[in-house]
Amino acid sequence: MQGWHQVLVIAGISALCTTTVDGASTEDGKAAFERREDTMKRMGRPLYLGIGRVVKGTVAYGPETVVAAETVAALASTLDRTLFPPGSDVAESRIKPEIFTAADPVDQLIAAVKSATVQLVPAVKTGDKAAITAAYDTVADACNACHTRFRKEE
């Protein structure tokens, strides 16, 4: 009888450990989603509101436009695959699960965003609307390439 008791105790401990691991991974996924969402918002706001409005002509070019470009470039330089870990496709996320198995395409898309944002700051510093527009479009296109492939529609 004591043998069965040990088996039941071990099974119970295993079940508790599994529950704890699953709970931790859900929390880790949620934290990863929140970090990704925060990073994208902190990068998107200065791009679309700070520079995009200058491109559209609804806001005048100024020193804050350069700060916006520097912010976008600084944040883009930190992008890597750790923003997209398996399990971060929580209910609030619009990420497609295909991203978790697409390492090479994700790396290429991240490299394209980084490359585009490196060109953004010098273009914005010129103050030339055509140069700013071209650089802005290149960055927006690079960002949208990833969103188109790996983000669900709203």
For each feature predicted by the language model, list its residue ranges.
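Sec/Tat signal peptide C-region and signal peptidase I cleavage site
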Residues: T19-S25
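The canonical Cys-X-X-Cys-His
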Residues: V139-R151
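Extracytoplasmic c-type cytochrome modules immediately beyond a signal peptide or single-pass transmembrane anchor
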Residues: S25-T138
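Short Cys/His-rich "knuckle" micro-motifs
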Residues: E154
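Bacterial N-terminal signal peptides that target proteins for export
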Residues: M1-V9
